[in-house]
Amino acid sequence: MAAPEPAPRRGREREREDESEDESDILEESPCGRWQKRREQVNQGNMPGIQSTFLAMDTEEGVEVVWNELHFGDRKAFAAHEEKIQTMFEQLALVDHPNIVKLHKYWLDASEARARVIFITEYVSSGSLKQFLKKTKKNHKAMNARAWKRWCTQILSALSFLHACSPPIIHGNLTSDTIFIQHNGLIKIGSVWYRIFSNALPDDLRSPIRAEREELRNLHFFPPEYGEVNDGTAVDIFSFGMCALEMAVLEIQANGDTRVTEEAIARARHSLSDPNMREFILSCLARDPARRPSAHNLLFHRVLFEVHSLKLLAAHCFIQHQYLMPENVVEEKTKAMDLHAVLAEMPQPHGPPMQWRYSEVSFLELDKFLEDVRNGIYPLMNFAAARPLGLPRVLAPPPEEAQKAKTPTPEPFDSETRKVVQMQCNLERSEDKARWHLTLLLVLEDRLHRQLTYDLLPTDSAQDLAAELVHYGFLHEDDRTKLAAFLETTFLKYRGTQA
């Protein structure tokens, strides 16, 4: 007969349960009620200047997020620069890239007792790159070269995006502690707001932002010119090179809690067996910032460059135009498909052609691949850069909204932050025969279905209608051109049927 469990152990379990319940307690809510702050604190990159980061819940999407608080001691100085602070966060809210931790929302909380900015960011639960590398080394495993290339490509994709903004966004705090890796291999860069906070805040508000370098153990991630007036995007390239070196060797040994020495970095460089990888990393770590390549050029280095497969190109094309297709298009197409039919064939000089049939395609693997491409794990790099994001972008609220901004907990602006993944519309004559009745269905990326109806004249512009939907917060700014083209095509087809 088993002995009864000791009472102290049961007591410890009850204590752990109580602690877990305490951590899930809701301490505070956002003004709109969507974000709920919990007691549990999280570490998402040791962001200097952020006094507290808590786990929070997004009650609309049912996912965990991070609740960040930036505190200001001088209440009067904060009030004097409130507009500049809002503009700074509006700029950050525009930064949208699959390999960058997303800033979802922000608001100001200014009372007689305190002044703070609260902003909600994406939560990456799988941990930092440094934690992953330590775990890999502890398990006596070597770094897979293919994984190294994939991670470098994703990090450079994010840096190329930031540096292509106008003006360029310099990360300024890129280390293996501020790079996160998800369970599916997706890389996310955090603390993008570090440099903007350090440089954009006025001198009298600079006190909560520690502009000095990170703790000693991370000093080796920063180049010699770091902190100088004229430093630029090359700062991030040096930091990336050190991250790439650490990923390749798993760990650069430090002397206890002190900084990593030049000798340790040299030993790590010499341990690289691949000459292309060594040359790639050394070009990033050049002492002269003018000799470091740009993030975009590094993507074309021979150690990373590869010709994209037709499968990957087709996947990106499919995802970019998925908004034109029904939600269950893949399922419907495969139902009507003859699985024994030939999908493709390759002629052989001697003998019959090599054939692939639909039955050889794993639709489950195909769905997973499409999801990975959609999430940003396989970016397209061998093409011209997309139109750069223009910053700063001044969002002028209506007068009544500007008045609200002076209240303790304002909502800065109401704009749609979710992208459209599917569009459908129907046109028919209205009862008076002079107008068209438009029914528009928009499926957003969180699967929200938004159905809109509108009576319009045949002479109305698709561009004006799309702009109006953006203005009233029904459509993301990035989807305006896409929707306008979709509506224009629909209008032309409908006019043809009425002729």
UniProtKB/Swiss-Prot annotation:
Expressed in Purkinje cells of the cerebellum and neurons in the CA3 region of the hippocampus. Also detected in non-neural tissues including mesenchymal layer adjacent to epithelium in developing bronchi of the lung, the epithelium of the stomach as well as cells in the liver. Keywords: Cytoplasm, Neurogenesis, Phosphoprotein. One of its GO terms (cellular component) is cytoplasm. It comes from the Eukaryota. Residues 36-304 form the Protein kinase domain. It is found in: Cytoplasm. Residues 18-28 have a biased composition (Acidic residues). One of its GO terms (molecular function) is protein kinase activity. Residues 7-17 have a biased composition (Basic and acidic residues). The modification Phosphothreonine is found at residues 407, 409. Gene3D superfamilies: Phosphorylase Kinase, domain 1, Transferase(Phosphotransferase) domain 1. CDD domains: PK_MADML. Pfam families: Pkinase (PF00069). Residues 1-31, 396-416 are annotated as: Disordered. The keyword Transmembrane does not apply. GO terms for biological process: negative regulation of macroautophagy; negative regulation of neuron apoptotic process; neuron differentiation. May regulate apoptosis of neural progenitor cells during their differentiation. Belongs to the protein kinase superfamily. Ser/Thr protein kinase family. The protein kinase domain is predicted to be catalytically inactive. This is Nuclear receptor-binding protein 2. It comes from Mus musculus.
